């Protein structure tokens, strides 16, 4: 009688250890799935920098705009990586021709701030060192 009980306990203990060591649901990456992106990840930061650069190239405003905050950042692994960003950008006091634009202060006066909420999709092929803007949409905040 003791052997079946010991065997059952051993099986239960083995299963508990196996479950504890298996990847959690949130740790599994499924190709094509969309997941929250880690804002501290160097690749995500590079994609955000690319977004702001492309955004400033496309605007006719003489003033540089920079990131105020990230509302949402997601990524999707496909034949490369799709990044989806929802961000808020603000107008700085620097013109686009000035150096060190990443540290420019934002306009203080409300009529000059011209904040915008934007959504961007970026496609990156890391092994080809290629990044492209797929989709962008902005509206006044």
Swiss-Prot record:
It comes from the Eukaryota. Thiol protease inhibitor. One of its GO terms (molecular function) is cysteine-type endopeptidase inhibitor activity. Expressed in submandibular and sublingual saliva but not in parotid saliva (at protein level). Expressed in submandibular gland and parotid gland. Residues 1-20 form the signal peptide. It is found in: Secreted. This is Cystatin-SA. Coiled coil: none annotated. Disulfide bonds join 94-104, 118-138. The record marks 32 as: Reactive site. GO terms for cellular component: cytoplasm; extracellular space; vesicle. Keywords: Disulfide bond, Protease inhibitor, Secreted, Signal, Thiol protease inhibitor. SMART domains: CY. One of its GO terms (biological process) is detection of chemical stimulus involved in sensory perception of bitter taste. Belongs to the cystatin family. Pfam families: Cystatin. A motif (Secondary area of contact) lies at residues 76-80. The keyword Magnesium does not apply.
